[in-house]
Swiss-Prot record:
The gene is minE. This is Cell division topological specificity factor. Pfam families: MinE. Prevents the cell division inhibition by proteins MinC and MinD at internal division sites while permitting inhibition at polar sites. This ensures cell division at the proper site by restricting the formation of a division septum at the midpoint of the long axis of the cell. One of its GO terms (biological process) is cell division. Belongs to the MinE family. It comes from the Bacteria. It comes from Neisseria gonorrhoeae. The keyword Ligase does not apply. Keywords: Cell cycle, Cell division. GO terms for molecular function: identical protein binding.
Length: 87
């Protein structure tokens, strides 16, 4: 190690710096809570299509949420089904 490197440090390669910055950005995006994933509206629509084949249910009766619990992502789906008439 030369005296200049010792005083001024080693210059990192731009690829290494870019990779490190990208990893920080990705980690920050993953850590953000309260944001819904992009696929939830599509999931909701497709669930509605499938459910409508079997049960008369409105879009207002389907609730989809995503949250973190104990370090894990949890996708919660609540569907309020209409009351069935007893025969």
């Amino acid at each position: 190690m030369s005296l200049i490197e010792l005083l001024f440090g080693r210059k990192q390669k731009t690829a290494t710096v870019a990779r490190d910055r990208l990893q920080i950005i990705i980690a920050q995006e993953r850590a953000q809570e309260g944001q819904t994933p992009d696929y939830l509206p599509t999931l909701r629509k497709e669930l509605m299509e499938v459910l409508s084949k079997y049960v008369n249910v409105s879009l207002d009766n389907i609730r989809i949420s995503q949250e973190k619990q104990d370090g894990m992502d949890v996708l919660e789906l609540n569907i309020t089904l209409p009351e069935q008439k007893k025969v």
